[in-house]
Amino acid sequence: MAVKIRLKRMGAKKNPFYRIVVADSRSPRDGRFIETIGTYNPVAEPAEIKINEELALKWLQNGAKPSDTVRSLLSKQGILEKFHNLKYGK
């Protein structure tokens, strides 16, 4: 099973709010997911990002691939750098 970390759209029309979820790559965007690891609100000024660092690192170590948008959110929070240091032992 190929697992991805991606955004699940929530909120009202013209007022998006996203949950950062771990899901099977074959399931639809807003369909079934395995676990929620955070939230992202692009409407707030500045954009509001909340990610559970421990869960994100756990799933990255288990081989979950982040989508492009989630990858940029993780790097803004410094989580990808920590994952890189854990993986390559620096």
UniProtKB/Swiss-Prot annotation:
Task: For this UniProt record, give its keywords in alphabetical order, as a comma-separated list.
Answer: Ribonucleoprotein, Ribosomal protein
Q: Where is the signal peptide?
A: none
Q: Which domain of life is it from?
A: Bacteria
Keyword Ribosomal protein appears in the UniProt entry: yes
GO BP: any one term: translation
Under PROSITE patterns, the record lists:
RIBOSOMAL_S16 (PS00732)
- Molecular function terms from GO: structural constituent of ribosome
Would the keyword Ubl conjugation turn up in this protein's UniProt record?
no
- Tell me which InterPro entries the record gives: Ribosomal_bS16, Ribosomal_bS16_CS, Ribosomal_bS16_dom_sf
The record's Gene Ontology cellular component field reads: cytoplasm; small ribosomal subunit
Family listed: Belongs to the bacterial ribosomal protein bS16 family.
Q: What NCBIfam families does the record point to?
A: S16 (TIGR00002)
List the protein's name. Answer: Small ribosomal subunit protein bS16
The gene it comes from is rpsP
